[in-house]
Amino acid sequence: MNRCNDETLQGFISLPKRIWQTSLLLYDMVNLIIENIEYCSFSQSSIVKRGDEAIMYEELSAPLPDKKRYLERIGFTGELKPNLDTLNRLILAQLHTVPFENLDGYDVGRDILLDTESLFDKIVVQGRGGYCFELNGLFMSLLQDIGFDCYPVMVRVVWMATGYMPISHCAGIVTIEGIRYFCDVGFGGPAPCSALRLDDPGEQQSGANRFVFAQAPDGDFIIYRTVDGGREQLLKFNDRPCQNVDFLAPNEYLSQNKQSGFKQMRMINIAREGGSAAINNNVLRLHQGGQVEETLLDTEDKLREALLNYFGLAVSFPLKL
């Protein structure tokens, strides 16, 4: 795509120098996003390619293909009512069966597609995991199918961070009987394993951890985790509803840009009874009862065995060592 035509350039130059220089920079940024995510004609409502097939905007919010099969994937049984008990059981079931993982982006370099059909095929049919935009995206589709009043929100990860962090995460807000709850099944860090009441200023217990919400000066919410008598910040977000299309640009950057942490390190995590299992690059870490056991996975066979045994991931593509 050309930077701009003569008519557009003339319009820029008629403005003060600083303004049109900034406008050109913004124009370049927009063009870069458009080129990187292979936008098609806006008049056709198409966005990205799945092979040779264009994916339409509407497919990002398409209904869940098969609720029963999704529930079987996460081992969920029992009544399905849009209440808090069901929500918490769904969150826990998902966290213990569907791993956070970036194998497609790190090991394969494959595009991460966010339409419902692609997410369902990857997570449910293939038995894979994914990262935040995939996991929370499909989970929101499940909740909507069940009848929950819910919507996604954009999130900044501020855990172990300094300075102003960009939007790189998503989560969901669910309203039950007039009360808003925050839920997240796609954070690779120390996330709550149940829904948290958004407007409760006190500490809330979730599994072995305690969390608390606070409001930042800009009006955003910040989630803190209580650690050793103190607090560490985890996530910062605005409760404004988003659309799934809003996650296309950050998803493209995080999954494809060489500067993204997801392109520089293998990250896998799953909750276990009383702990968790994680792989960072080629190191397996098992957290159990406050103890951590580390194992170096220095061969591809060891890595594949760990992926299958601890995360339920059976993959056939080559893995980096």
Describe each region flagged by the PLM.
Residues N5-D6, Y27, D52:
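Acidic/polar hotspots within intrinsically disordered regions
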Residues M56-G129, Q144-P166, F187-L321:
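Mixed-charge, low-complexity segments
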Residues C170-G172:
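Short beta-strand scaffold segments in enzyme catalytic cores
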Residues V174-I176:
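Active-site beta-strand termini and strand-to-loop segments that position acidic
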